[in-house]
């Protein structure tokens, strides 16, 4: 009698592309030995739209609506980096009031991004309830955005030298009310999630990254701070008016998925502290630098000639980017979002290189999931927090 032999071939499984409402159009080719992950190969590019090349054929103001499609859950940060680069090239000063408004909008956007990370992350590991809770607070933030900018998601609010419009009457009081309410919401999340034994079983000790390893991989944001590295560009680069406020860099030393969760939960509380201080200390004055208008090149345009005088026209403001290069970065919710800009005495950038945090943080995924269980892939991928719009650009 012949004994049947057991086949030991690896199983190759396609995970994704996922729906954009979850982790985006990311495809993972996973090699499995039973439930154990042997190899994982991410396939990118499904959402590539040529954002860098588009930037080289647009003025800064024309390009501003495009950038909100990178990380479409934290659009204030993509607008901020797009505006900060030409501001530094032209040495343009931002009024105090505008700087305070920017900080408020950035921190509200950080909270909204972390909330929409928390809900799907919990759904990935089997907890559906928080997915609905986070939308309650997120809608309140979007109501504030809509009142100030007119848009709930793609705001198009930042401008070179300031912001597009001042805060409407009563907005500051509504925002302060939201801050008081949201602090109780964070406490509720921590009671529900942080000490939940089922949650801890899924995330504790899963996807561990050491501090030196995180630096070598070029990780940033909560991925880096959860590995024991106290690095936050708001403290390091002193941009906008963050130095005027009292807040702490949130970090953990364990480096696992639980540590990354704790960092993001703590960051939401710190963002509320920053917003409250910015609202209470917001000065009067202009919300934009009116001197920027003297840099406008459209007054010399042929469209201002005699024969075009009866045509109604409202050109977008443009000015030349001087012939130099610089790298500008901000601390986005997912990590270091940077722009390498090269000017060429033209209204168009000669080179516009995007440094997306999600793309670089994603590179460590294959190493983290090796020798883990299949179910741990979604836990680790969720803890990285990626948006494919900025990964593929």
UniProtKB/Swiss-Prot annotation:
Cited InterPro entries: NADH_Q_OxRdtase_suD (IPR001135), NADH_UbQ_OxRdtase_49kDa_CS (IPR014029), NDH1_su_D/H (IPR022885), NiFe-Hase_large (IPR029014)
Pfam families per the UniProt record, alphabetical: Complex1_49kDa
GO BP: photosynthesis, light reaction
Hydrolase in keyword set: no
Subunit record text: NDH is composed of at least 16 different subunits, 5 of which are encoded in the nucleus.
Function: NDH shuttles electrons from NAD(P)H:plastoquinone, via FMN and iron-sulfur (Fe-S) centers, to quinones in the photosynthetic chain and possibly in a chloroplast respiratory chain. The immediate electron acceptor for the enzyme in this species is believed to be plastoquinone. Couples the redox reaction to proton translocation, and thus conserves the redox energy in a proton gradient.
Protein name: NAD(P)H-quinone oxidoreductase subunit H, chloroplastic
């Amino acid at each position: 009698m012949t004994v049947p032999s057991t086949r030991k071939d690896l199983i190759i499984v396609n995970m994704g592309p996922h729906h954009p409402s979850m982790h985006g159009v990311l495809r993972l080719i996973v090699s499995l030995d039973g439930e154990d992950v042997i190899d994982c190969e991410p396939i990118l590019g499904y959402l590539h739209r040529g954002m860098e090349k588009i930037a080289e054929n647009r003025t800064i103001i024309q390009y501003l609506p495009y950038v909100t499609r990178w990380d479409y859950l934290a659009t204030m940060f993509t607008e901020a980096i797009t505006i900060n680069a030409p501001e530094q090239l032209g040495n343009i000063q931002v009024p105090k009031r505008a700087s305070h408004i920017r900080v408020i909008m950035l921190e509200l956007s950080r909270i909204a991004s972390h909330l929409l990370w928390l809900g799907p992350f919990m759904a990935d590991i089997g907890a559906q309830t928080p997915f609905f809770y986070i939308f309650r607070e997120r809608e309140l933030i979007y109501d504030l955005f809509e009142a100030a900018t007119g848009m709930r998601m793609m705001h198009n609010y930042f401008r070179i030298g300031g912001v597009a419009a001042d805060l409407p009457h009563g907005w500051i009081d509504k925002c302060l009310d939201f801050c008081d309410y949201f602090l109780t919401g964070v406490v509720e999340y921590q009671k529900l999630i942080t000490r939940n034994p089922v949650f801890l079983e899924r995330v504790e000790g899963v996807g561990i990254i050491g501090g030196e390893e995180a630096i070598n991989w070029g990780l940033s944001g909560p991925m880096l701070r959860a590995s024991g590295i106290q690095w936050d560009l708001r403290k390091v680069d002193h941009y906008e008016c963050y130095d005027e406020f009292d807040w702490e860099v949130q970090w953990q030393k364990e480096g696992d998925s639980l540590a990354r969760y704790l960092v993001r939960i703590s960051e939401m509380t710190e963002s509320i502290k920053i917003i409250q201080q910015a609202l209470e200390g917001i000065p009067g004055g202009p919300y934009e630098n009116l001197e920027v208008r003297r840099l406008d090149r459209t007054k010399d345009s042929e469209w201002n000639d005699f024969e075009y005088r009866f045509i109604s026209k409202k050109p977008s403001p443009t000015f030349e980017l001087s012939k130099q290069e610089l790298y500008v970065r901000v601390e986005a919710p997912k990590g270091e979002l940077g722009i390498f800009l090269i000017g060429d005495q033209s209204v168009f950038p000669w080179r516009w290189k995007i440094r997306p945090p999600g793309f670089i943080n994603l590179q460590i995924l294959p190493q983290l999931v090796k020798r883990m269980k299949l179910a741990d892939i979604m836990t680790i991928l969720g803890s990285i927090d990626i948006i494919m719009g900025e990964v593929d650009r």
